[in-house]
């Protein structure tokens, strides 16, 4: 269309509230999120390891990535594996590359090299504590989980050499409850369950993103907010997706706000 205003011009925002191309820092924290983050930080300070489990899109990665990004680099060495579905040796290589360990030599098994390297870091005069975070950990083979557990102990000092954070969906929580996973589960201080947002928290989540995007506060009418809350059941990624579709529909219809009527008439929302 000729002289069609952009979405930013039409709605009067600086950023799209639900865009994936810019990062909100800090992310939205519910009260439960804040408690989880505070407790997780305390555990890391004492060399502990833990899991965070919950439905895909619940906000696990966002919360822990923000926690990791704020760890003091003078005391912590961060290792982030974004995908737990790597083969056993590929996982060790990915960790080695982030630690600066040569991964192509065959004289010494890579797992042994990593164990020695991490132990050396832990026993150095100015020691630093590695924190290994693995996302999509429900895809990890049991052998890979055992490898990871072997990296977090320091036999010379009989103390923790590193901390392990594994993030996964509800399948990971079920896996950890199996008897054959007990050697792994006992090395984790706790499994934090990441719960969906309540309806009130969903509205707070949307309002927070609108505020961070410098968008009009009344972008979503109250009845539309209530419908989004009921439809998405507190699932953050779905809230983002539904919000994106509704704003696109409002833009197409030349509406400045998202109403309940617009929500009900949007055939792309399933």
Please identify what each model-predicted range represents.
Residues 81-84, 176, 189-202:
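Conserved AAA+ ATPase "SRH/arginine-finger" region at the nucleotide-binding site
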Residues 68, 172-187:
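Short regulatory helix/loop adjacent to the ATP-binding pocket of P-loop NTPases
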Residues 1-7, 161, 183, 200, ...:
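C-terminal alpha-helical "lid" subdomain
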Residues 13-18, 76-78, 86-105:
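Conserved NTP-binding/hydrolysis module of P-loop NTPases
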Residues 41-42, 108-127:
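Conserved alpha-helical scaffold flanking the Walker A/P-loop in AAA+ ATPase domains
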Residues 49, 119, 126, 130-166, ...:
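Conserved Walker B catalytic segment
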Residues 46-66:
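Walker A/P-loop nucleotide-binding motif
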């Amino acid at each position: 269309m000729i002289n069609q205003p952009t979405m930013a011009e039409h709605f009067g925002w600086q950023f799209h509230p639900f865009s994936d191309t810019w990062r909100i820092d800090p992310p939205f924290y519910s009260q439960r999120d804040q408690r989880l983050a505070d407790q997780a930080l305390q555990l890391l300070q004492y060399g502990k390891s833990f899991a965070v489990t919950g439905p895909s899109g619940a906000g696990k990665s966002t919360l822990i990535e923000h926690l990791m990004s704020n760890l003091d680099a003078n005391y912590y060495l961060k290792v982030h594996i974004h995908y737990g579905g790597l083969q056993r040796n590929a996982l060790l290589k990915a960790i080695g590359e982030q630690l600066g360990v040569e991964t192509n030599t065959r004289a010494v098994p890579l797992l042994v090299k990593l164990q020695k390297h991490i132990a050396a870091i832990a026993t150095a005069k100015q020691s630093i504590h590695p924190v290994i975070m693995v996302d999509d950990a429900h895809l990890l083979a049991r052998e890979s989980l055992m490898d990871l557990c072997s990296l977090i102990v320091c036999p010379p000092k009989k103390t923790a050499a590193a901390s392990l954070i594994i993030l996964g969906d509800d399948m990971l929580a079920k896996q950890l409850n199996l008897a054959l996973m007990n050697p792994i589960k006992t090395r984790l201080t706790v499994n934090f369950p990441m719960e969906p947002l309540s309806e009130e928290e969903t509205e707070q989540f949307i309002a927070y993103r609108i505020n961070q995007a410098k968008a009009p506060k009344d972008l979503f009418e109250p009845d539309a907010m209530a419908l989004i809350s009921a439809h998405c059941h507190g699932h953050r990624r779905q809230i983002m997706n539904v919000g994106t579709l509704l704003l696109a529909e409002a833009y197409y219809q030349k509406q400045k706000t998202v109403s309940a009527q617009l929500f009900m008439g949007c055939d792309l929302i399933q």
